[in-house]
């Protein structure tokens, strides 16, 4: 139990990134020099919920500010929190755990909470670290709020859905928290806590930009992707009006003129997407440009024209592979011909397109990799693909890989 006379303070941390030797060899000294970087929107959502309920919150964005672990620890010491929440993807789990150990050196009484995609699947392993008090699984807003209130009041931890913790030598895995059905009930992300202006997009041309999450979940089942296993395969949407309220807030209060929708797939529902596009004009957001992820075979000329009128400037497509056997093996659910048709119609309407490609899927050969490279070239030369990015297939926790 925490002294009830004391203001409850929580510090949320996006931990330092580790720059690879390859990136360093090309002159990169921090993550913002490597690729497009976004503010930690998930932490900002949690912060918004905590602040709405009277908890004092600060947010440390170590990766984009170029902070070391020592820098982060100094800021945490200055804040003097009772709780520290650290987000972790698989690529930064070691950084997060190292930071957790350092936090406990400040004071063993600080409760350390870890969450994020890696924790969702590996919570029973991560909780065995002595420096980690709680693992939060799934959507973190309500779970973190309930957990902090429970610890503060000395309540029963087994009543908090979505957490894993240690009781002596035993690991306690509470039931999963059901997904929140009405996403409009969440507070907007606490963007006032962001350390501007460290963020940039591939298409912003120096403009301030902000990410937005308007939906959660993905109805598809790509074998390399953990998103449907974290957010569910049901596509949950905020109301159009709620999304427009947030867009208007960041447009007028923060001066943002470029939005990057971070939804796994924004355009699942055609009517909802068209209503959103038309609503932007009705709200007077005439010079607000934006980008989103699309899906091959899901867009139509009608939808793309509405998106173009609403100032959509680029759509990111997960094309992945140029070989039909590999596409089928990873359960993408579309054909090479559909790829060409989708890129062609996007270009014809006047929206730029970016293709995500991968290499190294199980059973791939030199020939299938060449198929992918050749498809990317063909799309650029003959169908209007504007840009492409290539990555190596990685078997992340929670995926069939």
What are these regions (language model features)?
Residues 38, 188-356, 361, 371-374:
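Radical SAM [4Fe-4S] cluster-binding motif and immediate context
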């Amino acid at each position: 139990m925490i002294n009830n006379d004391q203001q409850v303070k929580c510090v949320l941390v996006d931990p330092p990134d580790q720059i690879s030797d390859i990136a360093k060899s090309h002159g990169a000294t921090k993550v913002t020099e490597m690729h497009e970087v976004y503010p930690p929107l998930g932490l900002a959502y949690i912060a918004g919920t905590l602040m709405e309920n009277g908890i004092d919150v600060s947010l440390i964005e170590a990766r984009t500010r170029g902070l070391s672990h020592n820098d982060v620890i100094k800021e945490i010491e200055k804040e003097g929190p009772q709780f520290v929440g650290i987000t972790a993807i698989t690529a930064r789990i070691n950084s997060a755990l190292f930071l957790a150990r350092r936090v406990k050196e400040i004071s063993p009484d600080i409760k350390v909470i870890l969450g994020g995609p890696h924790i969702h699947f590996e919570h029973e392993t991560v909780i065995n670290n002595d420096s980690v008090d709680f693992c939060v699984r799934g959507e973190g807003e309500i779970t973190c709020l309930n957990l902090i209130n429970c610890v503060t009041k000395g309540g029963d931890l087994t009543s908090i859905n979505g957490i894993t913790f240690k009781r002596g030598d035993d690991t306690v895995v509470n039931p999963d928290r059901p997904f929140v059905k009405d996403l409009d009930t969440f507070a907007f992300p606490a963007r006032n806590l962001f350390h501007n202006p460290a963020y940039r997009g591939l298409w912003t041309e120096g403009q301030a930009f902000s990410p937005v999450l308007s939906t959660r979940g993905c109805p598809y089942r790509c074998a390399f992707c953990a998103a449907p296993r974290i957010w569910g395969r049901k596509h949950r949407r905020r109301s159009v009006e709620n999304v427009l309220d947030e867009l208007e807030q960041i447009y007028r209060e923060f001066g943002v003129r470029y939005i990057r929708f971070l939804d796994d797939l924004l355009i699942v529902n055609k009517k909802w997407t068209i209503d959103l596009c038309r609503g932007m004009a009705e709200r007077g957001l005439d010079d607000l440009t934006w980008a989103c992820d699309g899906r091959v075979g899901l867009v139509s000329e009608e939808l793309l024209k509405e998106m173009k009128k609403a100032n959509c400037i680029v759509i990111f497509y997960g094309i992945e592979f140029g070989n039909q056997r590999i596409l089928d093996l990873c359960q993408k659910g579309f054909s090479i011909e559909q790829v060409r048709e989708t890129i062609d119609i996007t270009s014809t309407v006047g929206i730029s397109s970016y293709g995500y490609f991968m290499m190294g899927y199980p059973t791939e050969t030199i020939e299938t990799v060449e198929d992918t490279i050749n498809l990317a070239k063909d799309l650029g030369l003959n169908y209007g693909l504007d840009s492409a990015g290539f990555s190596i297939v990685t078997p992340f926790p929670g995926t069939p890989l």
